Amino acid sequence: IYTMNDTLSLHDALPICRSPQQMFGAVIREYYRNPEINQGKKLVSVSIMPCTAKKEEILRPESMTNGRQDVDYVLTTTEVASMIRKSGIRFENIDGESTDMPFGIGSGGGVIFGVTGGVTEAVLRRLQTGHSRVEMDRIRTSGVRGDDGLKELTFDYMGKEIRAAVVNGLGNADKLIKRIHSGEVSYDFVEVMACRRGCIMGGGQPVGAGPRTRKARAKGLYDTDVNMQIKKSNENPMVLALYEGLLKGKTHQLLHRNLGVTEN
């Protein structure tokens, strides 16, 4: 959204894929179009996000499918926490439940999206042929992790050297954009997180987080990733089933931004 609003000269460099929120919203809405599944009930899609910008994203024309919002409402994690407290809900008194199927299986690559460098790390995993510990460790230690405002790394893909940059914080993004425009640097892939340290420190997260909390949030995502058997999206059986079923012939319509509309 920031690039679309403030640096239109880079608009053509943006990927055509939607954000995870918008992809999932479109898939959910398509899934529940089936009368046997919706059983005559009206679908209301609510997204819980650490990012306040997601509230605007659902209203943007290019984020809609056939002119309709795929996600109806966005609540931040802070708003949801407040609602839980006011409702008197005590998690220690609630029995745990498994996630709903068929959308309850995720990958470690998806989990680490929430920390700076996570998107790039997920891409690097996807480009590998397997997910042995050696391969995962090599990616993890490639320089993609850490809190630095700008990280640069290179990796080999099919005999070609790929240059990537990972930047977090819009101030750092502005500096990098100027360097790219001047010709000082050139990259094949750039990851930008608007918030320092990524989504774990998003504008919708609880405020006042100190260094210990920031580190704990990142560690929580990385620890979850370690314990997940599926490390990348193309190994997720639910994702593969979606492409063979619900998404067949609808990939562009449901997963890509609607570039045929006029942006305000």
Question: What label would you give each PLM region?
Answer:
Residues 1-7:
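Short, exposed "boundary/linker" segments that immediately precede the start
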Residues 8-264:
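Iron-sulfur-associated redox domains of electron-transfer enzymes in respiratory
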